[in-house]
Amino acid sequence: MSSMYHDYDHLTASGKGLWSKFYGLVDAAVLLYDEIQRRGKIVSEEESQKRIFCLFPRRKRSSLVKRQQKLNGGFISFTSSSLIDLNQLPTDSEIEDPQTSDSQMKTLQNSSSEPCTSLVLFDYKTAESEKMEAKTLQNPSSELCSSLVLSDYKMAESEKMETKDPPNPLSLCLTGNTSRKRRAVEERKRTGGFKKAKVAPFPGTARDTPKWLVKVMRDMKEAKDAKLIFEKTLFVTDINPTQNRLSMPFNNLLQNDFLTSVESRIIKEDINNNKKIGVGAILVDQRSVKWGVMLKRWELKKESGKGSWNYNLICGWNDVVEANGLKEGDNISVWSFRCRGVLCFAMEQSSSSLALCLC
């Protein structure tokens, strides 16, 4: 104790004696205070437990309840008089008043011969499974309690039946609040008199990637995302050297999502501006020859004020036409893909024009 005070060694003998006694008194006071607090806490906890379990009896374990039931020779029946009315429970102020609490406790004791047992069994019933509820139904003694238990049992049985035998969605649809047109369609489906129309697959996704393009992409390394974007029969303007461009009308594109957001912004800013060159790209033909081209957007306005716009491959298209022997009436397909982020196109010719070119 003396080690807690740094100046204890510097005191005189009489001073040390006085301080030692003072320390002893302080320690005794602290111990006494702790003991009083501990006893007060124990008393308050016991009083609160007595008060709680007086109003709401402690729930017994299921094994004890079953043992009591066997000793009594059967299930203890639920009666309306055996259940305590929660509205008659005393309030805090009434419990503090000894006169009112004694009279009301007698009333609670007289309301049931076994209040604790009935409350335990009531809680036990709600916590047990549906099998225990079915057993309890075998010996109901009160109309009120038996009707409540019977309604719960019927609800449980109905849920089981719904799980085992789910309702027919067709019958629900026919009997529900639907329009006459929907009911007629469902009736046709059920009787087999209604058939769905066959829809032709989208041409952009129906065709597989050509084998020659697969080989080209494999040789280029890191090439991916091949998609068919355009098919066309060449016109005179497409092979005219003075035009030097392949026109791809936007409305005729099979897919229009082959550009990145940056490329779309560049092309939009370069509309009908000859000083801007557009977006650079690579075009590959069926001979695996690569050509440098530019993609631009041209807007065509009509006298009515309405207009349309096209994608055009320029700056190198004449070389592609000459090398592949393209002429008016030839059918071509244009594919797009990416190689390390660079926009690439692949041109596939019809078999007849390709044979002439190879000769």
Swiss-Prot record:
Gene Ontology MF terms in the entry: DNA binding
Pfam families in the cross-refs: At2g31720-like
Metal-binding found in the keyword field: no
Disulfide bonds: none
SUPFAM superfamilies in the cross-refs: DNA-binding pseudobarrel domain (SSF101936)
Magnesium recorded as keyword: no
Region: Disordered, residue numbers: 92-111, 159-192
Family annotation (PROSITE patterns): B3
Keywords in alphabetical order: DNA-binding, Nucleus, Transcription, Transcription regulation
GO CC annotations on file: nucleus
Subcellular location: Nucleus
Compositional bias segments (type: Polar residues): 100-111
DNA-binding region: 250-351
Name by which UniProt lists this protein: Putative B3 domain-containing protein At3g24850
Annotated source species: Arabidopsis thaliana (Mouse-ear cress)
